[in-house]
Every structure is written in C-alpha cells, then in structure tokens.
C-alpha cells in the first residue's frame, strides 16, 4: 500500500525540500502552499500540488475532498507552513496577531482536525514550531506574535497526544532554531546561519517517518543557533 504524506508550506525553504525528499523515497505527496507553481514546475509524478491558504476555510474542504476521493488514508501530516512577523510590540496591531495566528495556530488546528479521520495507528502528525516558542528559551524583541503562536502549537501537540492516545496516532512537535530560509531573510535582513533548508529537511524527513515509533506528545528542540 502506498504511503501518503501531506506537507504544508511547500513553495520554498524546508517544505520545498521535504517534497523532493518524500517524492524520491516513493511517497505519494500532497504539497500545499498559496503558490503551487514551484512544486508543479518540478513535474514529479507522485506529487499533487494545488493552491492552498491556511486562513481560508474553503481550502480545507478541497483538501478533505481530495484525500477522501484519491487516497482514503494519510500516514504523515507535516504542519510546516508558517507566518513570521518581526515588528516592535508597540506597533503590532490586533490585525497583525490575527494574521500570524490564522496561519500558525488556527490553520494548524483545522488542518489536523480535517485529516485525523483519515489517519490510523502509527500515523504521525508532526508540527514545526520554533525555539522562540519554548518556555525558558532565549527570546527576541519584535517576535511577540510569532513566538507566542509557536508556543501555542507546542501545547496543542501535547493536548492532541492525550486526547487521541487510544487511537495509536502520534503527535510530535519540533522546535527549530534558525534556518537560512527566505522567510528568515525577509524578517531578519542580513542575518546568516549555517543551517540550510535541505539539511533541516533531512532531519525532519527522518523524524517524521520514524519518530512516532519512539515519541508521542513530545517537544524536541532542533537547534544549534537561535532564533
């Protein structure tokens, strides 16, 4: 039986690299991003991609319909999409918080809720968080909306693991340190770190395919630098 993985935030960075890795390993991949063109341009036979916005309710129905009609089950969900805002708290409006939380928290929760009925024992929901969302970690000015949203999905993961513990579905969260992605460069111009999207994608691929054998409801910190 084919293995099925859904990845959000696939137009660039870590998500883009993950799609290529899962495709190379023979998985059936559903790649979701507001801009589907970068993935479609790869012309990978085992990858389906269409425009998807975590803040739009109708887009979730499109995903649910696809999974129900084409796959029937999902082995791995990687909640990778994220919105990063670097802005002084005094200038961060309610609308700014809503924008970040719609993608980083509400979208993650809804995607997981929609996909769970298609998962089974040893299926894995892996959410990508940030070191900034970890209690006691170094914090950075300007990241009030972003880091607090990343803390929220850490707690969500722990709650899911408890609520669904009888199903055998596993939920884990990775708190990443800084990775040299376009999103990081946009938020922190000139900031450079040694970790590349491809290197981090290597780790996430391995953990998403094997981590559920050893962990459930766990936060793992994956960082040699911050934020």
Report each predicted region and the residues it spans.
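Substrate-binding pocket helix/loop in short-chain dehydrogenase/reductase
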Residues: 88-89, 96-98
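Conserved NAD(P)H cofactor-binding loop of Rossmann-fold oxidoreductase domains
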Residues: 80-85
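Rossmann-fold cofactor-recognition segment
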Residues: 44-58
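Conserved glycine-rich Rossmann-like NAD(P)H-binding loop of the short-chain dehydrogenase/reductase
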Residues: 25-40
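C-terminal helical subdomain
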Residues: 166, 173, 189-227
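N-terminal Rossmann NAD(P)H-binding glycine-rich loop of SDR-like oxidoreductase domains
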Residues: 11, 19
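Catalytic loop of short-chain dehydrogenase/reductase
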Residues: 126-152, 157-158, 162-165
């Amino acid at each position: 039986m084919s293995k099925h993985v859904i990845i959000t935030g696939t137009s660039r960075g870590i998500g883009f690299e993950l799609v290529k890795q899962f495709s190379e390993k023979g998985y059936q991949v559903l790649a979701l991003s507001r801009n589907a063109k970068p993935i479609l341009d790869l012309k990978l036979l085992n990858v389906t991609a269409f425009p998807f916005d975590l803040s739009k309710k109708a887009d979730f129905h499109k995903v649910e319909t696809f999974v129900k009609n084409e796959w029937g089950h999902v082995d791995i969900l990687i909640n990778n999409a994220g919105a990063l805002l670097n802005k002084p708290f005094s200038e961060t409006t309610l609308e700014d918080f809503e924008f970040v939380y719609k993608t980083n928290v509400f979208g993650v929760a809804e995607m997981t809720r929609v996909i769970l009925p298609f998962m089974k024992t040893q299926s894995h929901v892996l959410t990508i968080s940030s070191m900034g969302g970890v209690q006691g970690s170094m914090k950075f000015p300007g990241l009030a909306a972003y880091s607090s949203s990343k803390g929220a999905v850490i707690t969500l993961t722990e709650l899911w693991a408890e609520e669904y513990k009888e199903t055998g579905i596993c939920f884990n969260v990775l708190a990443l340190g800084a990775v040299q992605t376009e999103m990081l460069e946009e938020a922190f111009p000139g900031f450079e770190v040694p970790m590349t999207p491809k290197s981090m994608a290597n780790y996430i691929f391995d953990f998403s395919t094997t981590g559920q054998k050893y962990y459930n409801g766990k936060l793992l910190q994956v960082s040699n630098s911050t934020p």
